[in-house]
Amino acid sequence: MEKQYLTVTALTRYIKTKIEYDPHLQSVWLKGEISNFKNHSRGHMYFTLKDENARIAAVMFAGHNRNIKFRPENGMKVLVKGKISVYEASGSYQIYIQDMQPDGIGNLHLAYEQLKVRLEEEGLFSQVYKKTIPPYAKTIGVITSPTGAAIRDIITTIKRRYPIGNVIVFPVLVQGESAAPSIVQAIRTANEMEEIDVLIVGRGGGSIEELWAFNEEMVARAIFKSEIPIISAVGHETDFTIADFVADLRAPTPTAAAELAAPNIIELQEKVLQRTLRLQRAMRELVHKKEEKLQVLQKSYAFRYPRQVYEQKEEQLDRALEQLVLAKERYIDKKVNQLKQLSFYLEKHHPSQKIMQTKVAVETLQKQLQREMQTLLQTKEFAFVRAAQKLEALSPLKVMMRGYGLVYDEEKQVLKSVKDVSLGDAVSVQLQDGILDCSVSGIEERELNNGK
């Protein structure tokens, strides 16, 4: 019988078919530890599930993982549900996960803690970014369900405390998958309206699942970016959501949020009354002081004897006018004297006088320079004549005219001693009127006394 060889592809597909048709492998529950976690840009998750003795490749496509609330991380222990199949390209089997939750802690609780840590590290909870709630808001925006008890409590409280205030309700979903986008859109819409002074964002109490929209990251970031101050009012006093940490002010209940947003008109009226009374009291005191001052003035000499006061002032005015005239005359005399002194100074230091003096000085210096140059020239001419006479007396030609000559060897070097030549050497003798070419035929050494 001839053997039939399978291709690798055929064998792999056979094994894959066997696995996929096994009902025990199409609904598998596993628990293990995540490692080699990778979140693909397209949203798919790839990682390994392992325990102490084995490991299996795992895939969770974007269509399934978008529903999980927490972020898978390496080292996290999880419970997963999925099916086993074969990845033909590598011939390896792996689990395709359809659902996943943390092992030992609730899915939502883990997601809550993870987001809380991450946003706190980013600074979204910092007091630096908290906006001040206006004390007298004219218009209050309310973002909540239009049918819940929270909206009734908020509106009732605002109308009771601050009936002159305006309330604008932005109806939203407060639970379910569409709740978070609904809340985010309402916050954006409110920020586009200039008349809103403060926003209340919240709902009544409920389970963590029912309150989860206020733990969504998109809601937290929308609250943080809001230009309008936001008061969070989610659930009961013991409920804390991510929205509470990001909001500018947290109220334990919707009713408390309304009390924080709306001032108490009775208290305001009391304040107005107190300030009115203080103002009236201050005005009475001021009028009383002015009346006392008026009475003092009425009793003064000026009010009792106005004619005498007038005459005194007339006399003081006359004296003041006389002093003014005298002061004017003294001032004019002073300025005239200053003008005379200045004119004398200018005349004395006029440029024409300075130019004339400078011209005379220059002419004097020119004459002095000419005299000194003439004297120097004569001195130099006399010194030149004497130097010329000395040079002429020392000239070799003068010496030759007295019968002397210069003797040169064959190399045209002047002979100064008979020791510089030998018998038969050719020499030349320069006289005043020519040169003699000679030959040494004899040498006699002797010393001359006084040139003889």
From Swiss-Prot:
First-listed, main subcellular location of the protein, grouped into a coarse class: cytoplasm
Subcellular location: Cytoplasm
EC number: 3.1.11.6
GO molecular function: exodeoxyribonuclease VII activity; nucleic acid binding
Catalysis: reaction(s): Exonucleolytic cleavage in either 5'- to 3'- or 3'- to 5'-direction to yield nucleoside 5'-phosphates
Keywords, ordered alphabetically: Cytoplasm, Exonuclease, Hydrolase, Nuclease
Domain of life: Bacteria
Family: Belongs to the XseA family.
NCBIfam families: xseA
The protein's assembly and partners: Heterooligomer composed of large and small subunits.
Protein name: Exodeoxyribonuclease 7 large subunit
Organism: Bacillus thuringiensis (strain Al Hakam)
Gene of this entry: xseA
